[in-house]
Amino acid sequence: MSKRTTYCGLVTEAFLGQEITLKGWVNNRRDLGGLIFVDLRDREGIVQVVFNPAFSEEALKIAETVRSEYVVEVQGTVTKRDPETVNPKIKTGQVEVQVTNIKVINKSETPPFSINEENVNVDENIRLKYRYLDLRRQELAQTFKMRHQITRSIRQYLDDEGFFDIETPVLTKSTPEGARDYLVPSRVHDGEFYALPQSPQLFKQLLMISGFDKYYQIVKCFRDEDLRADRQPEFTQVDIEMSFVDQEDVMQMGEEMLKKVVKEVKGVEINGAFPRMTYKEAMRRYGSDKPDTRFEMELIDVSQLGRDMDFKVFKDTVENDGEIKAIVAKGAAEQYTRKDMDALTEFVNIYGAKGLAWVKVVEDGLTGPIGRFFETENVETLLTLTGAEAGDLVMFVADKPNVVAQSLGALRVKLAKELGLIDETKLNFLWVTDWPLLEYDEDAKRYVAAHHPFTSPKEADIAKLGTAPEEAEANAYDIVLNGYELGGGSIRIHDGELQEKMFEVLGFTKEQAQEQFGFLLDAFKYGAPPHGGIALGLDRLVMLLTNRTNLRDTIAFPKTASATCLLTNAPGEVSDKQLEELSLRIRH
């Protein structure tokens, strides 16, 4: 077997006149009667190879037998294509290879779907079952090439900044808070279980107490939670921790790293600092803690209308400490019919809204179901508050503040997609800061950590832990990209007494805290430095930088929405012998 000269997708005019050896898969084959053209494919792309009896009759005969997805080796001379046959759609479109020798390395059965880039309308379950074939498609091959470039850029940046890449355990202890753990039974310790890590949070804090100062890890994490388009049961995290830093230091580091990645991978220079917004401002203006700022359509408080108008829904909402907010779809009045508005009403119902009120602005006032409730002065108030003009569609939700935020926040994104308001070429990074430290869980009747129990409160709010925990703010920060939470971080608690107080507020007894987190509390007794960090979702970063819409397209062998692997049929049953060794019995 001859040595490969280069990749198929890298054969350019620089190789003109050279005899080269290529190896790859037959993407397609065209027999023109006396001449056979084959598009030969590998991970870098496609090149056209020509079988001409003038160069080799024997090679032509073999080429007559090859079919799609055969693995072949060809030798030949690189020549310039005739001007009328140049293919500007591919990198190698100026040249072709006149084949003098071909060897069939391996044959292929007819694939269950075409690998050709033009045929992508295949049921996703079929693609996942034959994932090794799906990954041959150039679109996915380029996605994973970019994933490699992104991780390489991250590693180079962190290495240059003095971070140590340190691995942490995969078999660890199950702890409360957060999503459900994936559990691993121990054979050696009867009836006891390990948990797969949801993140290396506690270990990276222990590494700071160990004195390593700067740590990072590109690490697998596991969460047994309900899936959606941007969630997987196992995912990859860029995990970072630093000692003797404050919030500003961590945010600056994260920002510089992301700018470097975007410049190296996308060729895009991001000038200036990333915009910042407090959690309260994000919720007030966008109804989301991860707002998409590529378009406007902000939420506008029009609660004044509830005090001025004789419209029972608005009036009752304000009297019961609710609020009324509106969004304006510019120029969309004619585009949305009453049937469309009914569909939008059903959409906001999903988020708890009882209804969606709306009006269309016309030259002489308002039309729509609630237009008749607006007196002249009410119309003026609405137009002044919202800036709405003739031709605009104004939508209202009147309810509790959290319902208003969630429903209108989701609606603005839906409308932006329908109206084509989103510039898909933009990369809008945003820091969301000043998060609540705690949230109240109505079902459990207790406080839970908004991020995790190891996030430090702002120094001015420490006293509130004993008096008004719901008012305490955290030294926490999330990085958002185009409406997706890319990652989050915080300055951690490094004082044992404060950590114990935090556990107490979260409803742990001293005994429970010691049993679950005693190793951390013990470590705090031996001199813990101030420390903080951030964790970024690598799969999600790749998804956004490659303009994919599904996280599964960025993971080589992903799970389905029901957390199954269609390729290997995992999860699967195990033998009675294995269960017996683990002292387990399955109840059906």
Curated annotation (Swiss-Prot):
<keyword id="KW-0648">Protein biosynthesis</keyword>
<dbReference type="InterPro" id="IPR006195">
    <property type="entry name" value="aa-tRNA-synth_II"/>
</dbReference>
<feature type="region of interest" description="Aspartate">
    <location>
        <begin position="201"/>
        <end position="204"/>
    </location>
</feature>
<protein>
    <recommendedName>
        <fullName>Aspartate--tRNA ligase</fullName>
        <ecNumber>6.1.1.12</ecNumber>
    </recommendedName>
</protein>
<comment type="function">
    <text>Catalyzes the attachment of L-aspartate to tRNA(Asp) in a two-step reaction: L-aspartate is first activated by ATP to form Asp-AMP and then transferred to the acceptor end of tRNA(Asp).</text>
</comment>
<feature type="binding site">
    <location>
        <position position="485"/>
    </location>
    <ligand>
        <name>ATP</name>
    </ligand>
</feature>
<dbReference type="GO" id="GO:0140096">
    <property type="term" value="F:catalytic activity, acting on a protein"/>
</dbReference>
<feature type="binding site">
    <location>
        <position position="451"/>
    </location>
    <ligand>
        <name>L-aspartate</name>
    </ligand>
</feature>
<dbReference type="InterPro" id="IPR045864">
    <property type="entry name" value="aa-tRNA-synth_II/BPL/LPL"/>
</dbReference>
<dbReference type="InterPro" id="IPR047089">
    <property type="entry name" value="Asp-tRNA-ligase_1_N"/>
</dbReference>
<dbReference type="GO" id="GO:0004815">
    <property type="term" value="F:aspartate-tRNA ligase activity"/>
</dbReference>
<dbReference type="GO" id="GO:0016740">
    <property type="term" value="F:transferase activity"/>
</dbReference>
<dbReference type="GO" id="GO:0003676">
    <property type="term" value="F:nucleic acid binding"/>
</dbReference>
<feature type="binding site">
    <location>
        <begin position="223"/>
        <end position="225"/>
    </location>
    <ligand>
        <name>ATP</name>
    </ligand>
</feature>
<feature type="binding site">
    <location>
        <begin position="537"/>
        <end position="540"/>
    </location>
    <ligand>
        <name>ATP</name>
    </ligand>
</feature>
<dbReference type="InterPro" id="IPR002312">
    <property type="entry name" value="Asp/Asn-tRNA-synth_IIb"/>
</dbReference>
<comment type="subunit">
    <text>Homodimer.</text>
</comment>
<keyword id="KW-0067">ATP-binding</keyword>
<feature type="binding site">
    <location>
        <position position="223"/>
    </location>
    <ligand>
        <name>L-aspartate</name>
    </ligand>
</feature>
<keyword id="KW-0030">Aminoacyl-tRNA synthetase</keyword>
<dbReference type="InterPro" id="IPR004364">
    <property type="entry name" value="Aa-tRNA-synt_II"/>
</dbReference>
<dbReference type="GO" id="GO:0006422">
    <property type="term" value="P:aspartyl-tRNA aminoacylation"/>
</dbReference>
<dbReference type="InterPro" id="IPR004524">
    <property type="entry name" value="Asp-tRNA-ligase_1"/>
</dbReference>
<feature type="binding site">
    <location>
        <position position="492"/>
    </location>
    <ligand>
        <name>L-aspartate</name>
    </ligand>
</feature>
<dbReference type="GO" id="GO:0005524">
    <property type="term" value="F:ATP binding"/>
</dbReference>
<feature type="binding site">
    <location>
        <position position="177"/>
    </location>
    <ligand>
        <name>L-aspartate</name>
    </ligand>
</feature>
<feature type="binding site">
    <location>
        <position position="232"/>
    </location>
    <ligand>
        <name>ATP</name>
    </ligand>
</feature>
<dbReference type="GO" id="GO:0005737">
    <property type="term" value="C:cytoplasm"/>
</dbReference>
<dbReference type="InterPro" id="IPR004115">
    <property type="entry name" value="GAD-like_sf"/>
</dbReference>
<keyword id="KW-0547">Nucleotide-binding</keyword>
<dbReference type="InterPro" id="IPR047090">
    <property type="entry name" value="AspRS_core"/>
</dbReference>
<dbReference type="InterPro" id="IPR029351">
    <property type="entry name" value="GAD_dom"/>
</dbReference>
<dbReference type="InterPro" id="IPR004365">
    <property type="entry name" value="NA-bd_OB_tRNA"/>
</dbReference>
<dbReference type="InterPro" id="IPR012340">
    <property type="entry name" value="NA-bd_OB-fold"/>
</dbReference>
<comment type="similarity">
    <text>Belongs to the class-II aminoacyl-tRNA synthetase family. Type 1 subfamily.</text>
</comment>
<keyword id="KW-0963">Cytoplasm</keyword>
<keyword id="KW-0436">Ligase</keyword>
<dbReference type="Pfam" id="PF00152">
    <property type="entry name" value="tRNA-synt_2"/>
</dbReference>
<dbReference type="Pfam" id="PF02938">
    <property type="entry name" value="GAD"/>
</dbReference>
<dbReference type="Pfam" id="PF01336">
    <property type="entry name" value="tRNA_anti-codon"/>
</dbReference>
